[in-house]
Amino acid sequence: MRAVLSSMLFFIFSSTMAQEFKTDVSYKYMFSNKWDKAIQTYNFSRPFIETKQPLLIHGINASLSNIFKSSKRLKHGINLSYSYFKSSAENQNLNNNLNLHFFNLGYIFHYKNNEKAKGLYTDLIISAVSSGLFRNVNDEPFEYDDKKSKAFGIGGDLSIRAGYYLNLKNKIYLSPFVLVGYTPYIYSPNSEAVINQTKGLVSNDWNGIFTTQVGFTFHVTQQKND
Protein backbone atom coordinates (compact mmCIF):
# COMPACT_ATOMS: atom_id res chain seq x y z
CA MET A 1 0.00 0.00 0.00
CA ARG A 2 2.85 2.40 0.80
CA ALA A 3 4.42 1.67 -2.59
CA VAL A 4 1.12 2.45 -4.34
CA LEU A 5 0.71 5.74 -2.45
CA SER A 6 4.32 6.71 -3.15
CA SER A 7 3.81 5.97 -6.85
CA MET A 8 0.68 8.12 -6.94
CA LEU A 9 2.47 11.04 -5.25
CA PHE A 10 5.38 10.73 -7.67
CA PHE A 11 2.97 10.69 -10.61
CA ILE A 12 1.17 13.81 -9.36
CA PHE A 13 4.50 15.60 -8.93
CA SER A 14 5.62 14.62 -12.43
CA SER A 15 2.44 16.14 -13.91
CA THR A 16 3.92 19.61 -13.31
CA MET A 17 6.52 18.80 -15.99
CA ALA A 18 4.08 17.20 -18.43
CA GLN A 19 3.57 18.21 -22.05
CA GLU A 20 0.89 15.57 -22.60
CA PHE A 21 -1.47 13.82 -20.20
CA LYS A 22 -3.01 10.48 -21.21
CA THR A 23 -5.60 8.21 -19.67
CA ASP A 24 -6.78 4.96 -21.23
CA VAL A 25 -9.12 2.02 -20.73
CA SER A 26 -8.72 -1.32 -22.50
CA TYR A 27 -9.63 -4.96 -22.70
CA LYS A 28 -6.68 -7.12 -21.64
CA TYR A 29 -5.93 -10.72 -22.57
CA MET A 30 -3.39 -12.68 -20.51
CA PHE A 31 -1.58 -15.97 -21.10
CA SER A 32 0.20 -17.43 -18.08
CA ASN A 33 1.19 -21.04 -18.63
CA LYS A 34 1.89 -21.90 -14.98
CA TRP A 35 -1.21 -20.28 -13.54
CA ASP A 36 -3.25 -21.94 -16.29
CA LYS A 37 -1.81 -25.33 -15.32
CA ALA A 38 -2.64 -24.73 -11.66
CA ILE A 39 -6.29 -23.99 -12.53
CA GLN A 40 -6.46 -26.97 -14.90
CA THR A 41 -5.10 -29.21 -12.13
CA TYR A 42 -7.71 -27.78 -9.76
CA ASN A 43 -10.45 -28.77 -12.23
CA PHE A 44 -8.97 -32.22 -12.94
CA SER A 45 -8.61 -33.10 -9.25
CA ARG A 46 -12.23 -32.18 -8.54
CA PRO A 47 -14.34 -34.25 -10.97
CA PHE A 48 -17.43 -33.68 -8.83
CA ILE A 49 -17.74 -30.01 -9.83
CA GLU A 50 -20.05 -29.39 -12.79
CA THR A 51 -18.90 -25.86 -13.61
CA LYS A 52 -15.16 -25.85 -14.18
CA GLN A 53 -12.98 -22.97 -13.02
CA PRO A 54 -12.25 -20.63 -15.96
CA LEU A 55 -8.68 -19.62 -16.69
CA LEU A 56 -7.48 -16.16 -15.72
CA ILE A 57 -7.31 -14.77 -19.25
CA HIS A 58 -9.90 -11.97 -19.67
CA GLY A 59 -9.46 -8.69 -17.83
CA ILE A 60 -9.57 -4.91 -17.94
CA ASN A 61 -6.84 -2.31 -17.69
CA ALA A 62 -6.76 1.40 -16.89
CA SER A 63 -3.73 3.67 -16.91
CA LEU A 64 -2.52 7.25 -16.52
CA SER A 65 0.54 8.72 -18.26
CA ASN A 66 2.48 11.97 -18.16
CA ILE A 67 4.74 12.77 -21.13
CA PHE A 68 7.46 15.27 -20.21
CA LYS A 69 8.06 18.51 -22.09
CA SER A 70 10.51 18.14 -24.98
CA SER A 71 11.03 19.44 -28.50
CA LYS A 72 12.37 16.07 -29.66
CA ARG A 73 10.38 13.41 -31.49
CA LEU A 74 11.34 10.86 -28.84
CA LYS A 75 9.88 11.94 -25.52
CA HIS A 76 9.91 10.38 -22.07
CA GLY A 77 7.30 10.01 -19.38
CA ILE A 78 5.80 8.16 -16.42
CA ASN A 79 3.00 5.58 -16.55
CA LEU A 80 0.77 4.11 -13.84
CA SER A 81 -1.52 1.21 -14.71
CA TYR A 82 -3.94 -1.14 -12.97
CA SER A 83 -5.28 -4.46 -14.29
CA TYR A 84 -7.96 -6.76 -12.93
CA PHE A 85 -8.81 -10.37 -13.79
CA LYS A 86 -11.50 -12.59 -12.31
CA SER A 87 -12.27 -16.30 -12.54
CA SER A 88 -15.63 -17.38 -11.12
CA ALA A 89 -17.28 -20.82 -10.95
CA GLU A 90 -20.65 -21.40 -9.30
CA ASN A 91 -21.54 -24.92 -8.18
CA GLN A 92 -23.90 -26.39 -5.63
CA ASN A 93 -22.62 -25.33 -2.20
CA LEU A 94 -19.35 -24.18 -3.77
CA ASN A 95 -18.91 -20.75 -5.34
CA ASN A 96 -15.21 -20.26 -6.02
CA ASN A 97 -13.76 -16.89 -7.09
CA LEU A 98 -10.19 -15.93 -7.97
CA ASN A 99 -9.37 -12.21 -8.08
CA LEU A 100 -6.07 -11.12 -9.61
CA HIS A 101 -4.79 -7.54 -9.45
CA PHE A 102 -1.75 -5.94 -11.11
CA PHE A 103 -0.24 -2.53 -10.39
CA ASN A 104 2.53 -1.22 -12.69
CA LEU A 105 4.82 1.79 -12.38
CA GLY A 106 6.58 2.38 -15.69
CA TYR A 107 8.81 4.66 -17.72
CA ILE A 108 7.62 5.55 -21.24
CA PHE A 109 9.55 6.23 -24.40
CA HIS A 110 6.97 8.03 -26.58
CA TYR A 111 7.72 8.52 -30.29
CA LYS A 112 5.84 10.16 -33.13
CA ASN A 113 7.03 11.44 -36.51
CA ASN A 114 4.30 13.50 -38.15
CA GLU A 115 6.44 14.17 -41.22
CA LYS A 116 6.44 10.48 -42.22
CA ALA A 117 3.34 9.09 -40.48
CA LYS A 118 0.99 11.81 -39.31
CA GLY A 119 -1.15 10.76 -36.37
CA LEU A 120 0.69 7.53 -35.61
CA TYR A 121 2.66 7.06 -32.39
CA THR A 122 4.43 4.28 -30.52
CA ASP A 123 5.18 3.81 -26.84
CA LEU A 124 7.81 1.57 -25.29
CA ILE A 125 7.00 1.04 -21.60
CA ILE A 126 9.37 -0.53 -19.07
CA SER A 127 7.60 -1.24 -15.78
CA ALA A 128 7.98 -2.63 -12.30
CA VAL A 129 5.04 -4.96 -11.58
CA SER A 130 3.30 -5.94 -8.35
CA SER A 131 0.47 -8.47 -8.18
CA GLY A 132 -2.08 -9.74 -5.71
CA LEU A 133 -4.06 -12.98 -6.07
CA PHE A 134 -6.99 -13.61 -3.71
CA ARG A 135 -9.55 -16.39 -3.38
CA ASN A 136 -13.08 -16.33 -2.01
CA VAL A 137 -15.26 -19.40 -1.42
CA ASN A 138 -18.98 -18.86 -0.90
CA ASP A 139 -18.33 -15.10 -0.62
CA GLU A 140 -15.86 -15.56 2.24
CA PRO A 141 -12.05 -15.30 2.14
CA PHE A 142 -10.64 -18.80 1.72
CA GLU A 143 -8.22 -19.98 4.42
CA TYR A 144 -5.18 -22.20 3.81
CA ASP A 145 -3.01 -23.37 6.74
CA ASP A 146 -5.23 -21.26 9.03
CA LYS A 147 -4.41 -18.10 7.09
CA LYS A 148 -6.36 -16.10 4.53
CA SER A 149 -5.44 -17.37 1.09
CA LYS A 150 -3.50 -14.69 -0.80
CA ALA A 151 -0.40 -14.42 -2.94
CA PHE A 152 1.63 -11.31 -3.67
CA GLY A 153 4.16 -11.02 -6.47
CA ILE A 154 6.77 -8.69 -7.90
CA GLY A 155 8.51 -8.56 -11.27
CA GLY A 156 9.16 -6.54 -14.43
CA ASP A 157 7.31 -5.92 -17.70
CA LEU A 158 8.14 -4.70 -21.21
CA SER A 159 5.29 -3.41 -23.42
CA ILE A 160 4.97 -1.88 -26.88
CA ARG A 161 1.92 0.20 -27.78
CA ALA A 162 0.88 1.63 -31.17
CA GLY A 163 -1.92 4.16 -31.60
CA TYR A 164 -3.39 6.78 -33.89
CA TYR A 165 -4.37 10.33 -32.86
CA LEU A 166 -7.92 11.45 -33.71
CA ASN A 167 -8.48 15.17 -33.12
CA LEU A 168 -11.58 15.91 -31.01
CA LYS A 169 -10.93 19.62 -30.51
CA ASN A 170 -7.98 21.95 -30.02
CA LYS A 171 -5.22 20.01 -28.16
CA ILE A 172 -7.62 17.21 -27.15
CA TYR A 173 -7.32 13.83 -28.88
CA LEU A 174 -8.71 10.30 -28.79
CA SER A 175 -6.63 7.38 -30.03
CA PRO A 176 -7.43 3.69 -30.55
CA PHE A 177 -4.44 1.53 -29.68
CA VAL A 178 -3.10 -2.00 -29.48
CA LEU A 179 -0.48 -3.14 -26.98
CA VAL A 180 1.65 -6.25 -26.60
CA GLY A 181 3.37 -6.96 -23.29
CA TYR A 182 5.73 -9.52 -21.81
CA THR A 183 6.49 -10.10 -18.15
CA PRO A 184 9.45 -12.51 -18.27
CA TYR A 185 9.64 -12.97 -14.52
CA ILE A 186 7.18 -12.38 -11.70
CA TYR A 187 7.99 -13.90 -8.32
CA SER A 188 4.80 -15.04 -6.59
CA PRO A 189 5.57 -18.09 -4.42
CA ASN A 190 2.07 -18.67 -3.00
CA SER A 191 0.01 -18.50 -6.19
CA GLU A 192 -0.36 -22.26 -6.62
CA ALA A 193 -1.40 -22.61 -2.97
CA VAL A 194 -4.14 -20.01 -3.47
CA ILE A 195 -5.45 -21.66 -6.65
CA ASN A 196 -5.08 -25.36 -5.87
CA GLN A 197 -3.96 -25.70 -2.23
CA THR A 198 -0.66 -27.25 -3.37
CA LYS A 199 2.93 -26.00 -3.69
CA GLY A 200 5.44 -27.07 -6.33
CA LEU A 201 3.09 -29.58 -7.96
CA VAL A 202 2.55 -27.84 -11.30
CA SER A 203 4.50 -24.57 -11.07
CA ASN A 204 7.57 -22.89 -9.63
CA ASP A 205 7.66 -19.79 -7.45
CA TRP A 206 8.08 -17.61 -10.53
CA ASN A 207 5.94 -17.11 -13.59
CA GLY A 208 6.08 -15.61 -17.10
CA ILE A 209 3.16 -13.72 -18.64
CA PHE A 210 2.19 -12.59 -22.14
CA THR A 211 -0.51 -9.93 -22.58
CA THR A 212 -2.33 -8.08 -25.34
CA GLN A 213 -4.58 -5.04 -25.03
CA VAL A 214 -7.05 -3.21 -27.25
CA GLY A 215 -8.53 0.07 -26.13
CA PHE A 216 -8.80 3.86 -26.35
CA THR A 217 -6.63 6.66 -24.97
CA PHE A 218 -7.78 10.19 -24.17
CA HIS A 219 -5.00 12.80 -24.63
CA VAL A 220 -4.69 16.39 -23.45
CA THR A 221 -1.65 18.18 -24.90
CA GLN A 222 -0.03 21.59 -24.59
CA GLN A 223 0.56 21.74 -28.33
CA LYS A 224 -1.13 20.39 -31.44
CA ASN A 225 0.03 17.06 -32.89
CA ASP A 226 0.62 18.56 -36.32
Regions found by a protein language model. Give the residues of each.
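Sec-dependent N-terminal signal peptides
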Residues: 3-14
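Short, charged, low-hydrophobicity "junction" segments
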Residues: 7, 98-104, 193-195
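Short glycine/proline- and aromatic-enriched beta-strand/turn motifs that initiate or cap beta-hairpins
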Residues: 18-78, 217-226
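Structural signature of outer-membrane beta-barrel domains
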Residues: 28-34, 83-89, 127-133, 181-187, ...
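Predominantly the C-terminal beta-signal and adjacent terminal strand-loop region
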Residues: 36-38, 163-226
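Extracytoplasmic loops and strand-loop junctions of Gram-negative outer membrane beta-barrel proteins
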Residues: 43-49, 90, 141-148, 195-200
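Aromatic-acidic/polar surface patches that form glycan- and anion
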Residues: 53-57, 96-98, 151-153, 205-210
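Gram-negative (and chloroplast) outer-membrane scaffold detector with strong preference
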Residues: 63-144, 148-161, 166-172, 218
